[in-house]
Amino acid sequence: KCRECGNTSPSCYFSGNCVNGKCVCPA
């Protein structure tokens, strides 16, 4: 879901959302 966000933690990469080029992880 967050492929375009660049370097992010694996958990954020798979479960997070991209907002303005940054990975926003669910609470």
Curated annotation (Swiss-Prot):
GO terms for cellular component: extracellular region. Disulfide bonds join C5-C18, C12-C25. One of its GO terms (molecular function) is toxin activity. The keyword Cytoplasm does not apply. It is found in: Secreted. It comes from the Eukaryota. Expressed by the venom gland. Belongs to the short scorpion toxin superfamily. Potassium channel inhibitor family. Blocker of voltage-gated potassium channels. Inhibits voltage-gated potassium channels Kv1.2/KCNA2 (Kd=0.96 nM) and Kv1.3/KCNA3 (Kd=1.3 nM). Does not inhibit Kv1.1/KCNA1, Kv1.5/KCNA5, Kv11.1/KCNH2/ERG1, KCa1.1/KCNMA1, KCa3.1/KCNN4, NaV1.5/SCN5A, NaV1.4/SCN4A or HV1/HVCN1. Strongly inhibits the expression of the activation markers interleukin-2 receptor and CD40 ligand/CD40LG in anti-CD3-activated CD4(+) TEM lymphocytes. This is Potassium channel toxin alpha-KTx 32.1. The lineage of its organism: Eukaryota, Metazoa, Ecdysozoa, Arthropoda, Chelicerata.
